[in-house]
Amino acid sequence: MNLIPTVIETTNRGERAYDIYSRLLKDRIIMLGSQIDDNVANSIVSQLLFLQAQDAEKDIYLYINSPGGSVTAGFAIYDTIQHIKPDVQTICIGMAASMGSFLLAAGAKGKRFALPNAEVMIHQPLGGAQGQATEIEIAANHILKTRAKLNQILAERTGQSIEKIEQDTDRDNFLSAEEAKDYGLVDQVMVPES
């Protein structure tokens, strides 16, 4: 069963059927609506690069409803957002958790949004290790370095002190849209259009 809707567009040249994501891409909208893994990251990065090649001046809109996922895959998206010329507006719909919240904060300053009932969750990276003691030590050191890097970037993106970020990400920390705004993860809570 195909759960991806199809949109039929009629022009003077005839009809064309698009899957909904391809149609949204024409309007510079990218949807991140799943766990972040390498395949999702490659898809998002490809779309960002494609939209930059089409028009390096127009904003790109990244809608996020994600429980998070792989840190390295998330960094691929984050670095691309920072690298490309167009501003990337980030919009939280539903939930932006873990790496999803990190990408929400990655949007262009002043252009990071959350819908009124959206939730944001920040925490420290998760990981596991097994094997010999030295292998466990290597893995532990790596995750500590990763945590420090994530905390440093979150501090820069939110305006919070590194100490506050470390304290607030020690455990799962759930924020409402308004709380995410006060924290600096988003710049504005979107109100319904009238």
From Swiss-Prot:
Keywords: Cytoplasm, Hydrolase, Protease, Serine protease
Record localization: Cytoplasm
InterPro entries: ClpP, ClpP/crotonase-like_dom_sf, ClpP/TepA, ClpP_His_AS, ClpP_Ser_AS
Record has Hydrolase as a keyword: yes
Substrates-to-products reaction catalysed: Hydrolysis of proteins to small peptides in the presence of ATP and magnesium. alpha-casein is the usual test substrate. In the absence of ATP, only oligopeptides shorter than five residues are hydrolyzed (such as succinyl-Leu-Tyr-|-NHMec, and Leu-Tyr-Leu-|-Tyr-Trp, in which cleavage of the -Tyr-|-Leu- and -Tyr-|-Trp bonds also occurs)
Enzyme class: hydrolase
Biological processes annotated in GO: protein quality control for misfolded or incompletely synthesized proteins
Taxonomy, superkingdom: Bacteria
GO molecular function, one term: ATP-dependent peptidase activity
Protein family per UniProt: Belongs to the peptidase S14 family.
Physiological role: Cleaves peptides in various proteins in a process that requires ATP hydrolysis. Has a chymotrypsin-like activity. Plays a major role in the degradation of misfolded proteins.
Record's subunit section: Fourteen ClpP subunits assemble into 2 heptameric rings which stack back to back to give a disk-like structure with a central cavity, resembling the structure of eukaryotic proteasomes.
Name of the protein in its database record: ATP-dependent Clp protease proteolytic subunit
Source organism phylogeny: Bacteria, Bacillati, Bacillota, Bacilli, Bacillales
